[in-house]
From Swiss-Prot:
Domain of life per record: Eukaryota
Role according to the record: Probable peripherally associated component of the endosomal sorting required for transport complex III (ESCRT-III) which is involved in multivesicular bodies (MVBs) formation and sorting of endosomal cargo proteins into MVBs. MVBs contain intraluminal vesicles (ILVs) that are generated by invagination and scission from the limiting membrane of the endosome and mostly are delivered to lysosomes enabling degradation of membrane proteins, such as stimulated growth factor receptors, lysosomal enzymes and lipids.
Location in or out of the cell: Cytoplasm, Cytosol; Endosome membrane
Similarity annotation: Belongs to the SNF7 family.
Alphabetical list of InterPro entries matching this protein: Snf7_fam
Protein name: Charged multivesicular body protein 5
Any one of the GO CC terms: endosome membrane
Keyword Cytoplasm found: yes
Gene3D superfamilies: 6.10.250.1710, ESAT-6-like
Main location class: cytoplasm
């Protein structure tokens, strides 16, 4: 059948805005290069005219410069038009992409809302309240157990008057213990003599014994 009717050609996808922008930008860059070459020619003609005298030759160079300048103006107009087209397509492309992003965001929010509804269905408020009540009861039971364990047994009753009397007596005993008069007596006792008994010195300051002879130092 393909031999008789021929095989259909695959459909070529239409160009996107991005493709069109790339194409237009490429054309604008090509025109910009042409403008740069014309600028170089204009500079060359201008330098020639500065060195030439007035006359037919200078007029001929001037006419060439005017033609080049005219071409430059045309190219500049084309470049500006292409740049404007590229800008418009970029704005349209930006708007389209923004709408796509918005749709994606809305779809994600819808999915999130569905998931939240499912999660809320699995959570029972009554079960949470029952759980809170159970926890509160267990805490009360734990407190009662602690109070029971800390209960004291066989503790005699103590008279407050007896405690105050004992406290007053304890204060007197502490005052007696704080008496430091014995320290004063120890401080007034005669000092311990220093040096060796019966030591004396002659007029030259040499230590002598009881017979007045110089002492031999011990080695």
């Amino acid at each position: 059948m393909n031999r008789i009717f021929g095989k259909s050609k695959p459909k070529v996808p239409p160009p996107t805005l991005t493709d069109c922008i790339t194409n237009v930008d490429g054309r604008a860059e090509s025109i910009e290069k042409k403008i740069s070459r014309l600028d170089a020619e204009l500079i060359k003609y201008k330098d020639q005219m500065k060195k030439m005298r007035e006359g037919p030759s200078k007029n001929m160079v001037k006419q060439k410069a005017l033609r080049v300048l005219k071409q430059k103006r045309m190219y500049e107009q084309q470049r500006d038009n292409l740049n404007q087209q590229s800008f418009n397509m970029e704005q349209a492309n930006y708007t389209i992409q923004t709408l796509k992003d918005t749709k994606t965001t809305v779809d994600a929010m819808k999915v999130g809302a569905k998931e939240m509804k499912k999660a809320y269905k699995q959570v029972k408020i009554d079960q949470i309240e029952d759980l809170q009540d159970q926890l509160e009861d267990m805490m009360e039971n734990a407190n009662e157990i602690q109070e029971a364990l800390s209960r004291s047994y066989g503790t005699p009753e103590i008279d407050e008057d007896d405690l105050e009397a004992e406290l007053d007596a304890l204060g007197d005993e502490l005052l007696l213990d704080d008496d430091t008069s014995y320290l004063d007596e120890a401080a007034s006792a005669p000092a311990i003599p220093e040096g060796v008994p019966n030591d004396s010195k002659n007029k030259d300051g040499v230590l002598v014994d009881e017979f007045g002879l110089p002492q031999i130092p011990a080695t």
